């Protein structure tokens, strides 16, 4: 329902953002910043598979949106020297959709399924023998005369990505030989990421300017790259194209993104709890009515980061604004 353009949203990129994102996306593991536990493990797994001449084990990547699951899938395929075919769970409506992709894979190729938790049960059933035995079971005909035939598939790697690992069925989850969780990024890692992005886009960005962007990026590369693009516009008009501390702070203030990465929607929610409901507890329906949003928007879009950062607590009686929330507004955000 929500129809607002939030800079701190982790929503999928629009077409223009996606074009820029592809230009700045790292291609190799040695360019991949942060997630050192993932990078070190994948380096070993990839090297071992290449030495044996095998396809890499099936890989499940999970974690919050915007942390680079698609980027990692592309890096894995590049490091393995294989093709990557890309699709998503909602797109694969029929078993035949998946069969068409699987039968066109070359040996050791990778198939990337984003939002794999949204696969239909019918399509998921096709995946089981494909992942385990590199075989495709296809039903020919209908009714009493229907028969099953098996097609051999070349060894391949399935790379699944999801924000909801808990929504995967056990049979599917258990067929992934490698499971990697992506964590939120530290401020130093985000500074490194945005500095690299600025170099790729030929934008002058100072170290302190990068720090200001990193502080407001909610631990998420997708957000920091989006902020960089918008601050660039401000810098070109107000700062001769250079992004330093002063320009970064002024631009982000104009864009209503404060030093903890909260935007006007976050502030609106927190101030409603504090001012209209004396800090809570307040039920979700009352809160939704107070700020003019749907309860699903609050639950799925606004609340997760505020809870994670300790601004809100969920209780059996409703939402409560924490001391951290009060302090945030006392100190001016």
From Swiss-Prot:
Q: What is the lineage of its organism?
A: Bacteria, Pseudomonadati, Pseudomonadota, Gammaproteobacteria, Enterobacterales
- Function summary: The RuvA-RuvB-RuvC complex processes Holliday junction (HJ) DNA during genetic recombination and DNA repair, while the RuvA-RuvB complex plays an important role in the rescue of blocked DNA replication forks via replication fork reversal (RFR). RuvA specifically binds to HJ cruciform DNA, conferring on it an open structure. The RuvB hexamer acts as an ATP-dependent pump, pulling dsDNA into and through the RuvAB complex. RuvB forms 2 homohexamers on either side of HJ DNA bound by 1 or 2 RuvA tetramers; 4 subunits per hexamer contact DNA at a time.
HAMAP family in the cross-refs: DNA_HJ_migration_RuvB
Its keywords, alphabetically, are: ATP-binding, Cytoplasm, DNA damage, DNA recombination, DNA repair, DNA-binding, Hydrolase, Nucleotide-binding
On the tree of life, the source organism's domain of life is Bacteria
Among the GO biological process terms of this entry, one is: DNA recombination
> What's the EC number here?
3.6.4.-
CDD domains, per this entry?
Answer: AAA
Record region (Head domain (RuvB-H)): 259-333
According to the record, the signal peptide region is none
Gene coding for it: ruvB
Q: Cite the binding residues for ATP.
A: 24-25, 66, 69-71, 132-134, 175, 185, 222
Q: Which GO terms describe its molecular function?
A: ATP binding; ATP hydrolysis activity; four-way junction DNA binding; four-way junction helicase activity
The domain-related comment in the record is: Has 3 domains, the large (RuvB-L) and small ATPase (RuvB-S) domains and the C-terminal head (RuvB-H) domain. The head domain binds DNA, while the ATPase domains jointly bind ATP, ADP or are empty depending on the state of the subunit in the translocation cycle. During a single DNA translocation step the structure of each domain remains the same, but their relative positions change.
- Report the family membership: Belongs to the RuvB family.
Q: Where is this region: Small ATPAse domain (RuvB-S)?
A: 186-256
Q: Which organism is it from?
A: Hamiltonella defensa subsp. Acyrthosiphon pisum (strain 5AT)
- Predominantly, its location class is cytoplasm
**Annotated stretches, region: Large ATPase domain (RuvB-L):** 4-185
Give the binding site residues for Mg(2+). 70
Q: Which SUPFAM superfamilies match?
A: P-loop containing nucleoside triphosphate hydrolases (SSF52540), Winged helix' DNA-binding domain (SSF46785)
What's this protein's name?
Holliday junction branch migration complex subunit RuvB
Q: Which reaction does it catalyse?
A: ATP + H2O = ADP + phosphate + H(+)
Record: residues binding DNA? 295, 314, 319
| Protein localization | Cytoplasm
Q: What cellular component terms from Gene Ontology apply here?
A: cytoplasm; Holliday junction resolvase complex
